[in-house]
Amino acid sequence: MLSAGTLIHGGVMVNYRCTAACRHCLYSCSPTRGSGYVDKETAENICRLLRTGGCRSVHIGGGEPFLDFDGLLAVIRLLRKAGITLEYIETNAFWADSNAPEKKGVQDKLKHLLSEGAGTLCISVDPYHAEYVPYGAPLALAELCEKTGVDYFLWKREFLPVLSRLDSKKVHSRDEMEKTFSDTYIYDTARSYGIGYGGRAVNIEREFSTGLDGALYPAEKFITDTAPCHNLLSTGHFHVDMYSYFIPPRCTGIRIPLSEAVDGIPGGKYPVFEALYSGGISALFKLAREQGFSPDEAGYPSKCNLCFHLRHFLSEKNYSELDRNHYEEALRYYS
């Protein structure tokens, strides 16, 4: 049976709900995703499987982990109990916004994190997040981290000179930022980030492909490629979601139970996964065509973009390895 082998480095996604729906979000998180948070039993099982798979350190992400602070603390404690090092916790800093009800208790939360041994935050700050969180909030959180002794890093600090042209106390629309920066700030930000065009970012690749990055190509250009997609079991930067699904790096929207990624994947159980893993885009296209897929006559900017749309189509056919919500949410918010 196939398995992921040693789990080298990963993240635990404690939820999918977020206060933002960023254009580059690989996991298609948003304010309208389910409001649940990983429960204790699932988190305990995740920790056990991570240990079994050889993983000794993780970060915590989402969604937005700080939407349920008590739930976050519970996960931190379980990781510590399992002997798994917590590297950092990701946040968009919404809870440090001067207008947020949570603002009053920020320092108390930071001190609580320190007491639990969770001493580092990864604080998001960039033009995409600025559509949903005033960029002053990450800066305010960073300042409070310094006062309380919590380590942090701004992801990505390089955008601060650009953002300084905006009002730090309010969010900004695409139209505002295009007028302030340029008509191509979305594409320029993606290039500066070095992002992969998965999740909601498939829209960035498609919108700007003809103008800046080549052209749209017919599906026929890509479907003869039989190279297997072994990235589906890559463990260099995998994630485990709140339902204990293993999610490979970059190829989001595909999921298999973490227990099977660790112990072995039964043959024949996941046709979409097996098609991609063994026969690449060619095999996946064949599977989709058999079920009625018609390629977009306008074309696709890349093989991976075509793959996303093939999986989106197949996600409506009840394949358990495909997260239908991921594809719907990826296409829902981009405008």
PLM regions with names:
Residues 2-40:
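Canonical Radical SAM [4Fe-4S] cluster-binding loop centered on the CxxxCxxC motif
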Residues 9, 29-38, 55-68, 84-104, ...:
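Core AdoMet radical
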Residues 27-36, 310-325:
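Iron-sulfur (Fe-S) cluster-binding segments and ferredoxin-like electron-carrier domains
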Residues 37-46, 319-332:
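Short cysteine/histidine-rich metal-coordination sites, predominantly Zn2+-binding motifs
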Residues 49-52, 80-81, 108-117, 141-144:
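Acidic (Asp/Glu)-rich catalytic clusters
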Residues 72-75, 98-111, 165-173:
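Distinct, well-ordered alpha-helical segments
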Residues 125-231, 235, 240-241:
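Classical nucleotidyltransferase
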Residues 191-315:
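Accessory C-terminal segments flanking Radical SAM cores
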